[in-house]
């Protein structure tokens, strides 16, 4: 059967403040670094667990025109996150499809300095927990791989709909802009309907070319500590890859943008509502280990487009195993 997708938590989307406002950065539903390969395919029934590791740096805080914010021209932020997770697929069908339930709690360390002359500081703690429920149905068919020892290939179309929820975490401090930027948690609720598809072609190059797309609509509740209201964020995530036996190699990325202004005490943030746009792109490699009921994955992402947020790079490693 298909290897399980690596699941869950916030993509690295960190919004920079104007110098006079607290730093607010929206959590975003979905996996660390974004969904990618097999994103609409659920694993076979069973209980799965694993960990996702993230290392990332934000090195250029930009305004709505994509220009560096002068007061933040020396700002730098680095984070290391570990996200242990569980994902359960009951042995039952609902409307002809499978149901999946996932939960993750990110734990990490974040170091930063924001303003010129400000010292570097670090914070460790627990981030925003994330839960997701999915329904997936395949219109395709399983066929054997051309390579011995590999999972069968699910050729054809698979669709998914679901709902994700980000919970306010416990490590949060809004006392200063720096402490807020360093907080592992964002202290806001996020309710996110999601949907997408995975399509795998017949074996043309190797075992088949796969196209996966996921969409998240992030709806935020006001941060009660700062009275900052983050505008809705739409997030389109994708991967184009080739199945080659136990390997899967390709390109992945995401494009996220806000469709509403950010507000403070109900007033839009000048001059442009601080509407964020962020796109990242990079390579991905997955390796299945059927003998151990597990898979590992690594990808690297770098910013290709940004407004009212940061230019950044990230490396994401994931491991999953069926218990």
Where are these regions (language model features)?
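Residues that define the transmembrane beta-barrel architecture of outer-membrane proteins
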Residues: 75-83, 97, 123-131, 157, ...
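Short loop/turn motifs that connect adjacent beta-strands in outer-membrane beta-barrel proteins
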Residues: 23-25, 38-46, 58, 90-99, ...
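Surface-exposed strand-loop-strand hairpins of Gram-negative outer-membrane beta-barrel proteins
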Residues: 24-28, 55-80, 116-122, 181
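Detector for outer-membrane/organellar transmembrane beta-barrel domains
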Residues: 162-165, 179-267
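Outer membrane beta-barrel transmembrane domains
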Residues: 27, 68-69, 223-323
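Transmembrane beta-barrel strands of outer-membrane/channel proteins
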Residues: 49-57, 101-109, 159-167, 211-217, ...
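Residues on the lipid-exposed face of transmembrane beta-strands in outer-membrane beta-barrel proteins
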Residues: 37-39, 51, 83-89, 131-137, ...
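Long, hydrophobic/aromatic-enriched structural stretches that serve as scaffold segments
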Residues: 74-140
């Amino acid at each position: 059967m298909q290897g399980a997708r690596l699941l869950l938590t916030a993509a690295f989307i960190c919004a920079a403040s104007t110098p006079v406002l607290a730093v607010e950065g929206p959590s975003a539903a979905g996996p660390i670094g974004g969904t990618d390969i097999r994103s609409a395919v659920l694993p076979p029934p069973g209980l799965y667990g694993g960990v996702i590791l993230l290392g990332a740096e934000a090195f250029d805080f930009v305004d709505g025109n994509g220009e560096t914010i002068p007061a933040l021209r020396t700002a730098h932020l680095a984070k290391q996150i570990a996200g242990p997770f569980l994902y359960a697929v009951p042995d039952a069908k609902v409307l002809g499809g499978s149901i999946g339930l996932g939960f993750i709690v990110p734990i990490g360390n974040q170091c930063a300095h924001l303003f010129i002359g400000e010292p570097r500081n670090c914070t460790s703690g627990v981030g925003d927990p994330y839960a997701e429920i999915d329904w997936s149905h395949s219109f395709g068919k399983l066929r054997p791989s051309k390579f011995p020892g590999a999972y069968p290939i699910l050729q054809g179309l698979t669709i998914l709909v679901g709902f994700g929820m980000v919970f306010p975490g416990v490590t949060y401090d809004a006392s200063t802009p720096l402490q807020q930027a360093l907080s592992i948690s964002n202290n806001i609720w996020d309710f996110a309907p999601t949907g997408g598809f995975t399509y795998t072609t017949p074996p043309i190059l190797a075992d088949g070319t796969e196209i996966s797309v996921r969409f998240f609509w992030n709806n935020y509740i006001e941060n009660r500590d700062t009275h900052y209201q983050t505008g809705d964020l739409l997030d389109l995530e994708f991967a184009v890859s080739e199945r080659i036996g136990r390997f899967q190699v390709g390109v992945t990325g995401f494009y996220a943008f806000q469709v509403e202004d950010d507000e403070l005490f109900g007033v839009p943030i000048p001059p442009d509502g601080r509407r964020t746009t962020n796109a990242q792109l990079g390579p991905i490699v997955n390796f299945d280990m059927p003998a151990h009921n597990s898979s590992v994955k690594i990808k690297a992402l770098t910013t290709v487009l940004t407004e009212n947020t940061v230019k950044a790079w990230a490396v994401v490693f994931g491991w999953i195993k069926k218990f």
